[in-house]
Structure formats: C-alpha cells, structure tokens
Amino acid sequence: MFSTSDGILTVEGVKVTEIVRETGTPVYVTSRALLERNLEAYKKAFSNEGLLYAVKANNNLALMRIIASHGFGADVFSDGELYLASLAGFRKDMVLFNGNSKSRKEIEMGVTAGVKFSVDSLDELRTISKIAKEVGKEVEIAFRVNPDVDPKTHPKIATGLRESKFGIPHEMVREAYEMALKLDGVVPVGIHCHIGSQILDLSPFVHALNKVMDIAVDIEKLGVELSFVDMGGGLGIDYEGKGAPTPKDLASAILPEFEGRKADLTSDPQLWLEPGRSIVGNTTVLITRVNAVKKGYKNFVAVDAGFNVLIRPAMYGSYHRVAVANKMDAEPEEVYTVVGPICESGDVLARDRKLPKVEVGDLIAVFDAGAYGFVMSSQYNGRPRCAEVLVSGDRWDVIREKESYGDLIEKQRLPEWLL
C-alpha cells in the first residue's frame, strides 16, 4: 500500500507531499487498505476463534471503528481504553479488562459496563467480588497466569517471565480459582496469559499454551467450566526487512496443539488472541521534515520529530526503516544518523543509514510506525502532539488534529494567590 509516484512516497493513491502541504509535519499517515488486509489475515487464520484488538497499540477512534466493524473484540488496559473501546463499537461480549493495578473506579466502570475481567491478583479478585455484590451483578472473570516462559524479545516487553509484574504464578493459580468459586459476584469462565510483545519465534507461544492447558485441565476438576483460553498477543512484525511470522504461521503453530489439548477437557473453550502491533504496526508511516543537515564526526539529519513523537527507538533501541520520502528514486549516497529536536542525546530515530543526499526541507519517512507511536507520544519540550491522517484509496482525512499551543496549557490552572 506504500509505493512511489514521480519519486514521491505514496500511501495508497495519495502522495505524502500533498498531505503535508495541509497538515504540516510531523504527521502519522495510515493506510486503510493495509489495516483491513491485516484484519482479514487474522480472521482467515483464526476463523473459529476469538480475536480481541489490543487497544494499547493504537487507540485512534477512526482506526478502532474499522477494526470493530470487522467483528473484533477489545483488550483494554485502563478505564480510558474501556471508554474508547465503547465509543468504537467493539463487541461487549468480547471486551476483556486487563491490567495488574486496576483502581476501584476502573473496576466499577468495568462491572457496570458488563465486560469480562482478567484478574491479576487475589486482592483484585476480592475487590471485583465486593463491587459486583454492591451493584447486584455477576462478573465473568479469567485469571492471568504468569507461565514463566521466555518470549525471546526485548526485556522491557517480556511479560511472562517469573520476575514480571504481571499475572499469578502458574504454581499458585489453582488457589485463585478455588477462592473465586467461593466468592459471590464472580464467575470464572476463562484463563488468560500474555507472554510479551514483538515475538518472532513461535515456539514460546506453544510452550506457554501447553502450560496454560495443563492448568485448564487441573482447574476443571474444581468445577470451572471454561468458555475461553486467552493466549494474549505478541506476534511481531518485520521492522528490519528480515521477515516475520504471519497470522497464518501462528495459527499453524498453535491451533493443532490447542485442539489436541482440548481433548483433555470436558468443556469446549474457544481460543482467544489479542493482536495489536501485528494489526496496526505496518499500516502507518511517520512523515517528518528535515530542519538541518550537520556534518562532523557523524552526518546528522535533524528532523522535526523526536522521541516526543515516536519514542520506540529511544526507549527500546528499536529499528525502523527510513527513507527520503521526496527522493524515493534517488540512489543512496551517504550514511546519516536521523535525530530529533529534543534536548537529550538519546533522541535518535535511526542510526547510520545510507540515504540519498539529504537537504533542508526534505521529508523523512519512518515506516512501521502504527503501533506504540502516537499513543506513547508526549508534549515534552513544550511541543504540541502531531496530527494523524487516514488514507482510503485516493481520499484522505485528518483523524486527529495537531495540537495547538493552547493545548499545552488547557488543563493547567493558576491559583488566585499567584495572580
């Protein structure tokens, strides 16, 4: 869905130069066609299973409306994400409230909304039970299991190891289900696990699934009737151009194992997954403008997007492909390091990349920026957040406006005694 025309990067049928003339830079530009292709790939690979979009990856309402229209549920991690998921129109019977530190306010909101909960601790279980009794509801729950499985990814996004803050240790989950069965207001109907993000080796998924299914067999003996086994998300994407497993590959790895292990159960649970990055990651390009080219010990290209706009390279050392969006047909000439305008030396988007000759005013495209891009952006250094655009064929529209200087102080208040 990304191509070139007259040496200019195009998103579907639109040149990015046309977009930035109106929006300015930086700007996130998303392809609707690519988003829908990713959604259909999951639906085809897991046609009889439950698919919940991980709202954390990208919470833009327009994009979530498209995702919800394809029949997806939602994995939410906060009251704000639950609010956005409700506006987007996700199936209520497939909204799972995740998270390791839910406040009473968040739990009350989820119980009132009638969503399912992934319970992360016994304290949380007691709070859900208490609130459910207060409002006269029964809440369907799963426990999040920590399986102690290495997902072979960046340590900051590995969530299923024993030292992770998430989930109940797999050796202690039986006790949690025993407690849930004795409490009013909660009904255990599932089991949940999420081992990490940007996973490119499928074997940890299979390892985790087998640990979870061992637990499922055990808790059924307590009288728990499982309606779903949620293995979370985490499928990685091809940031570096070296290849990545597809939803079809993931299905081939885990569905036969899941179906085989279900023979050990008396119930017939559905497999649930929570894709996020692999739905939206490759759909979006960040367009940023060159403010300066500085030569010295290194050739630096200074652009108007830094880790205030895309924090992944600074936070995780992540690799994103870059190109000169207005010189797509030009031959690479020099090695550059692309840096942002933020007052820290870690503000680097791309290191040592061979690009065509870069000049002031050129546009740098940062690819695969659809997941954990805008949602992790900030107003650091007093920089208003950028716009987001959706392209559909030869049409495009702004789906999030660029912030103004006024937005920097919108929620601030000056006490009268300072005036």
Swiss-Prot record:
Role, per record: Specifically catalyzes the decarboxylation of meso-diaminopimelate (meso-DAP) to L-lysine.
Pfam families reported for this sequence: Orn_Arg_deC_N, Orn_DAP_Arg_deC
Catalytic activity line of the entry: meso-2,6-diaminopimelate + H(+) = L-lysine + CO2
Keyword Cytoplasm attached: no
UniProt protein name: Diaminopimelate decarboxylase
Residues that bind pyridoxal 5'-phosphate: 234, 274-277, 372
Highest taxon of the lineage: Archaea
Gene (name only): lysA
